[in-house]
Amino acid sequence: SCIDFGGDCDGEKDDCQCCRSNGYCSCYNLFGYLKSGCKCEVGTSAEFRRICRRKAKQCYNSDPDKCVSVYKPKRR
């Protein structure tokens, strides 16, 4: 299921977990390598496209009712 904005996420997994509405996992870096205080935050379109593109598609496919994705099926 998706994590609400402000909810805890695991910074050791990756930067883009299933945060609601295309959010991303934002952490503080301590000493350059320890991640702490990781929370789901709203990302700008640039951040979202850079780190969350593939993950958002996976989240949307696994739980479309709870995740909003920019990837809607295109009609040809």
Curated annotation (Swiss-Prot):
Q: What are the annotated disulfide bridges?
A: C2-C19, C9-C25, C16-C52, C18-C40, C27-C38, C59-C67
Name the tissues where it is expressed. Answer: Expressed by the venom gland.
Location within or outside the cell: Secreted
- Keyword list, A-Z: Calcium channel impairing toxin, Disulfide bond, Ion channel impairing toxin, Knottin, Neurotoxin, Presynaptic neurotoxin, Secreted, Toxin, Voltage-gated calcium channel impairing toxin
Chain segments annotated as coiled-coil in the UniProt record: none
InterPro entries for this protein: Omega-agatoxin_II/III_CS, Toxin_34
Gene Ontology annotations for the cellular component aspect, listed alphabetically: extracellular region; host cell presynaptic membrane
Q: Name one GO molecular function term.
A: calcium channel regulator activity
What's the entry's take on its domains? The presence of a 'disulfide through disulfide knot' structurally defines this protein as a knottin.
Other notes: Negative results: does not inhibit Cav3 (T-type) channels.
Similarity comment: Belongs to the neurotoxin 04 (omega-agtx) family. 03 (type II/III omega-agtx) subfamily.
User: What exactly does this protein do?
Assistant: Omega-agatoxins are antagonists of voltage-gated calcium channels. This toxin blocks calcium channels in insect central neurons but not at peripheral neuromuscular junctions. In vertebrates, it is broadly active against all high-threshold Cav1/CACNA1 channels and Cav2.2/CACNA1B channels.
| Annotated protein name in UniProt | Omega-agatoxin-Aa3b
